[in-house]
């Protein structure tokens, strides 16, 4: 693992990179750990805002997962939180090896302006995205279906563009890997 705050600290590598981001406490660390079958590759926490740097993880010497700080509520000083925006924007807009961004959202919450602005920003910079709804196991099948539809409408996307995921049951894990594979092929 390597951590960075500015481009001169980024690892020198030609490996394709997939960045992971989302609101604080949406299950980003659990998603990454589940994808690589490791419980503690990325530290999980119930305290929002634990990820404060850009963290690079090389996976099987073939791909790099990049863990970005979460946006929204975080128990960190305002000065730290304000530095995340430029740090993340610099990474996303300048990294040649970046193949796409996984935007992680909690299925129990309708996305807000931050998620909508982030998706718009990704479109502006022509950065492909994968949209994941985590914590799907926390809802009944009926509520899952209703939230899936409501979130698709809120984001103005088709339901098929939203992958339902559960770190607990591993639901959606293969779909996430398939989507990552499609991004890397470009």
Q: Which residues does each PLM region occupy?
A:
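Short aromatic/hydrophobic contact patches that present stacked aromatics
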Residues: 17-19, 104, 164
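Conserved C-terminal guanine-recognition region of P-loop GTPase G domains, centered on the G4
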Residues: 86-160
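Conserved nucleotide-binding/hydrolysis micro-motifs of P-loop NTPases
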Residues: 5, 50, 63, 70-72, ...
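Structured catalytic cores of enzymes that bind and process phosphorylated ligands/cofactors
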Residues: 20-27, 32, 62, 100, ...
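Short, glycine/charged-enriched secondary-structure capping and boundary segments
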Residues: 14-15, 35, 78-81, 116-120, ...
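Switch II of P-loop NTPase G domains
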Residues: 10-13, 47-55, 69-99, 107-121
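Conserved G1/Walker A P-loop phosphate-binding module
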Residues: 1-75, 185-186
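Canonical P-loop GTPase G-domain recognition
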Residues: 1-7, 138-186
